[in-house]
Amino acid sequence: MDTKNLLKFRTSTRDYKDEKLDEAIAKKVYEIVNDEAEKLGRENLAFLLNTDGESVYKALNGVAGYRGVMIKAPAYIALDARNNDPATIVKGAYGVEEIITKLHKLGLGTCWITVSEVDEVVKQNAFNYSEGDINILLAVGYPLDDERREHSYIDRGATEDLVFLGDFDTPATDEDLE
């Protein structure tokens, strides 16, 4: 799939079925994560898979996620950056996107979760690590609503179809809005 189509059809899953990952699927996820860490270089990055979603959720609820709204999922993958080099974080983020693509092929949904404001000790308790810093967290699980994952893409509408001046009979042009 080319980048344009990837961006058009990629979805984020915020609601997951309340069931643990099947053992065979969990093994495949571990292999995907392990392969990506190997490819990117373990000296700078680690991907931590935690299939005890309940414990991660309890540890991070109220402090992680957009404005502290944590996404509840059966599993989480954390990007553990082993240094503060911005290139490491960028490389890791690309690695997470590769992982997301492979997880979607397994029928799993994913959602990025903000952890930048979470205290390091809290993150260490959630993922049991001692080296580096978790910069990115990914919720992983079976989507609650498969239909939403298969949504159809609609091209961006023209300004004239969405914005009006004074009344609904007077569409605004791009020039009007400048």
Language-model-detected regions and their locations in the chain:
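Acidic, surface-exposed loops and disordered segments
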Residues: 1-178
